């Protein structure tokens, strides 16, 4: 279905595009009869404002972009739900884009957020060594940026992350105190900082509690359910 534009509305009504635009915005300097004519025809033809054009005029989108690596785990669902509750409660809209643990997809999603002129970005990067340039560009443009769970290297931005080293160490300590002796670490990909820190905590605990680290104590794994 063809999208109806302000220009087409103006031609049908015999008005200038600027008058139609102001009438649709409820400008009281436009006669009430004119505003009603414009509103009536816009409704009949199914006119919908172009969000990008509206954002350009106002300089704001009242929208926050959220970049996630996946949306199937309980952790991801909890985080997304929390973000939505907080932002919706403040009158903001949310655009969620999944990178599927692919840096190229993540880059495309970030470029999409730029085109939509989002007022902020919340992201969980899939690779700490990739897409730093576009994240820095977003920051340089003055767009608020917050990383959660993971953060890329050399990008100065707010972050909400877990101390994975300490968490891994204390988990090992708990298992040792419960009498466990054959403990195996399922390690994630090395390009994910969380995975590196968890492995570091595991190995530190092995040494502290007198375990001998051999090739069988660490099993490489991915980040999906299939892995």
Per-segment meaning from a language model:
Residues 1-62, 200:
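N-terminal helix-turn-helix DNA-binding module of bacterial transcription factors
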Residues 2, 31-34, 69, 76, ...:
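Short, conserved glycine- and acidic-residue-centered signature motifs
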Residues 12, 17-22, 57-72, 174, ...:
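Short beta-strand segments enriched in small/hydrophobic residues
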Residues 36, 45-123, 200-203, 207:
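Amphipathic helical "hinge" segments at domain boundaries
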Residues 99, 125-128, 150, 187:
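Short secondary-structure boundary segments
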Residues 129-139:
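Active-site-adjacent beta->alpha loops and helix N-cap segments on the catalytic face
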């Amino acid at each position: 279905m063809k999208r109806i534009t302000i220009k087409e509305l103006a031609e049908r009504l015999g008005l200038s595009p600027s008058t139609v635009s102001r009438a649709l915005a409820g400008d009281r300097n436009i006669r009430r009869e004119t505003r009603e004519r414009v509103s009536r025809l816009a409704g009949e033809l199914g006119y919908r404002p172009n969000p990008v054009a509206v954002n350009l005029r106002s300089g704001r989108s009242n929208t926050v972009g959220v970049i996630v690596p996946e949306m199937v785990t309980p952790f991801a669902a909890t985080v997304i739900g929390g973000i939505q509750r907080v932002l919706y409660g403040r009158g903001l809209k949310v655009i969620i884009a999944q990178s599927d643990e692919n840096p190229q997809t993540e880059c495309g999603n970030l470029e999409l957020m730029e085109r939509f002129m989002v007022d902020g970005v919340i992201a969980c990067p899939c690779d700490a060594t990739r897409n730093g340039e576009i994240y820095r560009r977003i920051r340089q443009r003055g767009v608020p940026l917050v990383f959660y769970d993971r953060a890329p290297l050399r990008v100065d931005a707010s972050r909400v992350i877990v101390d994975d080293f300490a968490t891994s160490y204390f988990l090992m300590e708990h298992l040792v105190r419960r009498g466990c002796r054959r403990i195996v670490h399922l390690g994630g990909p090395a390009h994910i900082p969380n995975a590196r820190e968890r492995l570091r905590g595991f190995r530190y605990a092995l040494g502290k509690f007198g375990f001998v680290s051999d090739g069988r104590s660490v099993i490489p794994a991915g980040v999906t359910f299939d892995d």
